[in-house]
Amino acid sequence: MAQTLLATRQITKRYGSSVAVDGVSLTLQEGQIYGLVGQNGAGKTTLMRMMTGQTLPSSGELELFGETSPQGIDRMRANLGAVVETPSFFPFFTARENLEYYRRQRGIVGRGCIDDALRQVELGDTGSKKFKDFSLGMKQRLGLALALLNRPA
């Protein structure tokens, strides 16, 4: 049976009197691929922020890699990698320099992870090319490399 990576039980997020997410329960299993779709303003981003521990739910329970406490979730976030729709990179930095900047910002130990991430997304030979000169597909793959830097679970 696949391991549960993330589970939510009736999580809700309120901003004042406005309810952004209302009573969502779900379970994400290891080895599966999931998508999150919905209309604008439906709460997708808020749900993702709660699922990745960036914000806490107003009510309900979040379990991430078996941890339910806020402190445990902070520790477990090191096992996550996320790809955003529009990654923000420095245009005049190389791919390698951009990843090095984010590696340091996140406190990820070891420079080998940069070469590993670039190889995994087939950008190993473009590490010295400036981000501004990348094609759209290459920019998206660099965003994926960023998500792989900390070698997520």
Predicted segments with their positions:
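Conserved ABC transporter NBD signature motif
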Residues: 60-70, 75-76
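Conserved ABC ATPase "signature" region
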Residues: 100, 104, 111-126
